[in-house]
Amino acid sequence: MDLKTFGGRRNFVFRNWAGIYSSRPEWYFQPSSVDEVVEIVKAAKLKNKTIVTVGSGHSPSNMCVTDEWMMNLDKMNKLLDFVENEDKTYADVTIQGGTRLYKIHKILREKGYAMQSLGSISEQSIGGIISTGTHGSSPFHGLVSSTIVNLTVVNGKGEVLFLDEKSNPEVFRAATLSLGKIGIIVGATVRVVPAFNIKSTQEVIKFETLLEKWDSLWTSSEFIRIWWYPYTRKCILWRGVKTNEPQTKSRYSWWGSTLGRFFYQTLLFISTKIYPPLTPYVERFVFRRQYGEVETLGKGDVAIEDSVTGFNMDCLFSQFVDEWGCPMDNGLEVLRSLDHSIAQAAANKDFYVHVPVEVRCANTTLPKEQPETSFRSNTSRGPVYGNLLRPYLDNTPSQCSYAPIHSVTNSQLTLYINATIYRPFHTNAPIHKWFTLFEDTMSAAGGKPHWAKNFLGSTSFAQGQVKAEGQYQDYEMRGMATRVKEWYGSDLETFKKVRREQDPDNIFLANKQWALINGIIDENE
């Protein structure tokens, strides 16, 4: 079998966007059809090889690193179908699994539609954001997976499966957050809504103001996110609503300019590599340049942008990212604890954090039946669900109960906190002390990590071959296996069962060690 027939090539070097990890797979494939994907999977089985599928490489973790076979679906990026519902309050768009979000946005824009909620970037593939539990920030919207109507997947046996709520629901629940372990997503149908602009207000608030308004703040707007600057003791409160008002000029960004960006990265390099106690002063300087100093609650600056521009943001530089989700009701305790720990660490010159610490929310609760949609306009709040099945590996609190939009409180919400440490000019900065404290705090509050981020865990939580603590690099993942088993319980066992059924020869267990130390597979697999 000539593997070059399927776009295979050697000597390809994969690097993730952050530049933290790289690998040279034995073969790198870019198939252009489902049939080619099937043949590659069958060839891997024949030759006893594993396959990992990659898209944009935006996960900062090492979950996609392999020295065996790697597949990229960038050539599978076509629109397959577009169906509006009768009253045109939503539409179902079917695209190939390798389609990047920015191309989906272009397709939808031409048809007058948009995705319902997005994360911070649009470079990923649709298969990638489904597989990793991507989310935006809203008290009404949940994971992007909740907008998925159906999936077409090639499993480890080379079979092409159609999955939705009624057809193979168990496999569907596993595939809507699969970490690439169930199969290769070659097609997806996404429920989208009529296009809208986002009118956002951006306000400077004191950290104490955030705590004071905690109980009412998170449900005050359909889209909301907060950027916390601990050393400055201020936050940026961003709130957005859907609108048909005409678009305005986007906000000016000091660090979005060539000079500002270079200067900020240089300051980070100096504070990381030469004199860490400079870090709080760098934060205060950058905050003043970007936002000013005066609290602007109630009189922030306003911008009206298309939905994609409103959702997406500038993620600046290469970075380590550790994001966890916990019950919003525990959020005040978490923020106060982290604030105290960050201040104490700086006073003792123990460690320093980079900013912003991003604070977001989501509502992953699901109704028992599809809500009525005939009344909706393009500015109506809340989601139009593609399915009502919770993924087995959803890391958000499972105990929250659904409530209609007008009754949503913090008790329905997941609080996401994103701890970021930049890698100025692609040089590593220490993360272990800060991320370990952060993880302990979030875990104590009922939190769980985002699967695709740089969570560290502990040698006491891992399974399989574990090194002595001193043998790990500062940023190296130790593992979370025992915690994962506690957190996910029977859902994890069902996921494992589905995985074994769909991939009995472990074709998709590239980088098996990652799956093992985090409890996705058992030691005997």
Swiss-Prot record:
Cofactor(s) annotated in UniProt: FAD
FAD-binding PCMH-type domain boundaries: 20-195
Main location group: mitochondrion
A GO BP entry: dehydro-D-arabinono-1,4-lactone biosynthetic process
Coiled-coil annotated spans: none
Subcellular location: Mitochondrion membrane
Annotated Gene Ontology cellular component terms: cytoplasmic side of mitochondrial outer membrane
GO terms assigned for molecular function: D-arabinono-1,4-lactone oxidase activity; FAD binding; myosin V binding
Enzyme class at the top of the EC tree: oxidoreductase
E.C. no: 1.1.3.37
InterPro entries for the chain: ALO_C, FAD-bd_PCMH, FAD-bd_PCMH-like_sf, FAD-bd_PCMH_sub1, FAD-bd_PCMH_sub2, FAD_lactone_oxidase-like, Oxid_FAD_bind_N, Oxy_OxRdtase_FAD_BS
Known pathway: Cofactor biosynthesis; D-erythroascorbate biosynthesis; dehydro-D-arabinono-1,4-lactone from D-arabinose: step 2/2
Keywords: FAD, Flavoprotein, Membrane, Mitochondrion, Oxidoreductase
Pfam families per UniProt: ALO, FAD_binding_4
Catalysis: reaction(s): D-arabinono-1,4-lactone + O2 = dehydro-D-arabinono-1,4-lactone + H2O2 + H(+)
Origin: domain of life: Eukaryota
Residues carrying Pros-8alpha-FAD histidine: H58
Record-stated family: Belongs to the oxygen-dependent FAD-linked oxidoreductase family.
Name the record gives this protein: D-arabinono-1,4-lactone oxidase
